[in-house]
């Protein structure tokens, strides 16, 4: 989506050529394969685990096969540990809530989305130690700053890999186990 924002005589912006990078949250079009799979699911399968009739059993098989493929992709030992959520925000909230407990330490960055920072602040209110790493004037995070923020009780580093705001790709240090 391209748009050049210039004020018109009403004081409002008339967009003519701006590059809008937040496609993850607002993209309308999906790949054709996704559209076909959704339509097929609506018309041919039921709710997984909710009955013994053919459409429900097929839904359960699809769910099982999908979990198995994802477990293989991510080298997960147990496919039943793969969880599906409505969106990334819900997934992050679940992970943050389940992983961090009083006394734990977490590292994040000043560049993170509101949907990451809010649950981290809530955890901080409940005894989790939070370190927020700063960015430079270009929105770049120095990997050494992340490494330096880590402590003995660091349980997680919660941050994006690539920013749709700055276009920066972050290559974090990989801590040893």
Describe each PLM feature range.
Residues 2-177:
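Pyridoxal 5′-phosphate
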């Amino acid at each position: 989506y391209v748009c050049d924002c210039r004020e018109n005589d009403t004081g409002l912006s008339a967009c003519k050529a701006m590059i809008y990078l937040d496609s993850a949250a607002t993209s309308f079009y999906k790949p054709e394969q996704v559209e076909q799979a959704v339509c097929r699911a609506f018309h041919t399968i039921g709710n997984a685990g909710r009955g013994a009739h053919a459409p429900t059993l097929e839904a359960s098989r699809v769910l099982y096969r999908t979990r198995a493929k994802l477990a293989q992709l991510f080298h997960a030992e147990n496919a039943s540990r793969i969880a599906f959520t409505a969106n990334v925000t819900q997934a992050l909230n679940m992970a943050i809530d389940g992983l961090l407990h009083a006394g734990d330490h977490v590292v994040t960055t000043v560049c993170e989305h509101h949907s990451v920072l809010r649950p981290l602040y809530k955890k901080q209110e409940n005894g989790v130690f939070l370190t927020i790493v700063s960015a430079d004037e270009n929105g770049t995070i120095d990997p050494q700053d992340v490494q330096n923020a880590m402590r003995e009780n660091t349980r997680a580093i919660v941050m994006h890999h690539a920013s749709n705001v700055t276009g920066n790709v972050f290559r974090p240090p990989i801590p040893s186990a």
